[in-house]
């Protein structure tokens, strides 16, 4: 197969005492620029792996590298110009959408409260012209007093949150959801009736506070119902989330565009079809299994059975577009990016469960492998306790990757661990944590990470 115009020709394989060398690229978000540096070395020594397996950002790099004819230059150019916004991490867009949604919601709430909580619009005022400044003053004072009481109650709840949580947990034991919904309905209707009577009569009353409580009770009850209105309200609340209808903060469109641009300029045939060797792993939401998307048709049943024992499933892709979707799904960090639909099913990033799937390469028949990690592979010593949530999250990711690697290494075939003329597993990993975080996409940091790789 001749390389496409504009790409470097395939180098001759390096002479090594192995027949089938696998390249495993792990996940780690913006740290994935480190893998580009490793791929530059792989290209320089003319190493041509028979299998490339990628997870999360490793899947993105794997698909882009193979589609570019194993030429690192297009991928390096993407990394050296990539920022969080260009990869779909749209913090400004998210902020504007949230502000817009909150502004619209509060404005509509004020309209409702202006109609339902105003004595000037009550039946008593318009039908009987009954009322006085004294009634207005009393209503305003009652409103203010009740809002102050509510603020104090909220502050005390936050102050004694543990005690309140224990009390709620004790009271909620054995609660019937259907009965609770029925009681909520009765309370909401009773509060509505009281508010309407007072509103029509024009009596001194905390009008806006009362209208707020009634509105919240009615919305809570309607949202808890199983019917069409309840489903609509729940979907409306989820719809306030940007781009993804509540299944994540951002979509995968930006990552898809980057891969499609590289594939269009490269060779689509490298991503799907006979003679290819690409595996992209993602977590299936419906079954909880790790879906291993393979680029070749009719995978070996023995290969599929071995992965089934590791709670995985083999999913052959019919074309390059499906493999691109698989890579987008593999890099869809749960909670941040929405799940990606591939072959009619939803998948997300599998890095938290299997970040360096060595067993996939072994099951495929590899007799040696090059494993690229984005965190130190040695026992992760802790210099100081994590100072905040972000550093704690980074520490937990480091530990999860380290534990996953140790588990994979302990399941290597016995012949791989015996002394021999050459090591069968080469682990490439930074000696210290890399100077970047999961979402810190930046050209300067990327250049540093590529140099370290």
Residue ranges of model-derived segments:
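Amphipathic coiled-coil/heptad-repeat helices and related helical stalk/stem segments
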Residues: 6-8, 35, 255, 353-357
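A short, basic/flexible loop-to-alpha-helix module at the beginning of a structural domain
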Residues: 9-15
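A non-catalytic, amphipathic alpha-helix used as a structural packing/dimerization or gating element
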Residues: 448-452
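Short acidic, glycine/proline-rich loop/turn micro-motifs
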Residues: 65, 383, 436-440
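Short helix/strand-capping connector loops at secondary-structure junctions
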Residues: 428-442
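Conserved catalytic block of serine-dependent lipid acyl chemistry
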Residues: 23-28, 58, 243-250, 259, ...
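A short alpha-helix-loop-beta-strand transition element characteristic
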Residues: 263-279
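Patatin-like phospholipase
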Residues: 4, 16, 20-22, 29-253, ...
């Amino acid at each position: 197969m001749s390389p496409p115009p504009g790409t470097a020709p395939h180098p001759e394989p390096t002479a090594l005492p192995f027949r089938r060398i696998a390249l495993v690229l792990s996940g780690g978000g913006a740290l994935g620029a480190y893998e580009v540096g490793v791929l530059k070395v792989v290209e320089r020594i003319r190493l041509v792996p028979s299998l490339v397996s990628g997870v999360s950002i490793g899947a993105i790099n794997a698909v882009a590298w193979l589609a570019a004819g194993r030429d690192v230059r297009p991928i390096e150019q993407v990394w050296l110009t990539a920022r969080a916004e260009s990869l779909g991490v749209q913090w400004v867009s998210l902020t504007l959408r949230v502000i817009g949604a909150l502004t619209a919601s509060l404005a509509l709430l004020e309209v409702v409260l202006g109609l339902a909580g105003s004595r000037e619009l009550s039946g008593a005022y318009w039908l009987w012209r009954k009322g006085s400044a004294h009634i207005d003053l009393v209503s305003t004072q009652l409103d203010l007093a009740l809002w102050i009481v509510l603020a104090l109650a909220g502050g005390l709840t936050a102050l004694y949150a543990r005690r309140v949580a224990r009390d709620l947990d004790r009271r909620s034991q054995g609660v019937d959801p259907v009965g609770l919904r029925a009681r909520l309905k009765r309370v909401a209707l009773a509060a509505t009736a009281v508010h309407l009577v007072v509103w029509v009569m024009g009596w001194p009353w905390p009008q806006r506070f009362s209208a707020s409580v009634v509105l919240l009770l009615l919305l809570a009850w309607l949202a808890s119902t199983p019917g069409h209105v309840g489903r609509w309200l729940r979907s409306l609340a989820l719809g306030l989330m940007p781009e993804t209808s509540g299944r994540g903060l951002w979509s995968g469109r930006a990552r898809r565009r980057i891969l499609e641009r590289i594939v269009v300029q490269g060779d689509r045939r490298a991503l799907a079809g006979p003679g290819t060797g690409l595996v992209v792993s993602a977590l299936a939401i419906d079954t909880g299994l790790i879906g291993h998307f393979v680029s070749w048709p009719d995978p070996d049943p023995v290969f599929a059975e071995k992965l089934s024992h590791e709670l995985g499933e083999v999913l052959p892709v019919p074309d390059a577009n499906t493999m691109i979707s698989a890579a987008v799904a593999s890099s869809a960090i749960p909670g941040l990016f929405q799940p990606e639909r591939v072959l009619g099913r939803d998948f997300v990033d599998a890095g938290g469960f299997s970040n360096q799937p060595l067993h996939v390469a072994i099951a495929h028949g590899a007799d040696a492998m090059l494993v690229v990690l984005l965190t130190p592979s040695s026992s992760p010593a802790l210099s100081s306790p994590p100072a905040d949530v972000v550093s704690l999250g980074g520490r937990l990711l480091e530990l999860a990757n380290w534990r996953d690697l140790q588990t994979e290494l302990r399941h290597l075939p016995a012949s791989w661990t015996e002394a021999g003329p050459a090591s069968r597993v080469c682990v490439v990993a930074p000696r210290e944590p890399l100077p970047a975080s999961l979402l810190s996409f930046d050209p300067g940091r990327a250049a540093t990470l590529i140099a370290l790789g």
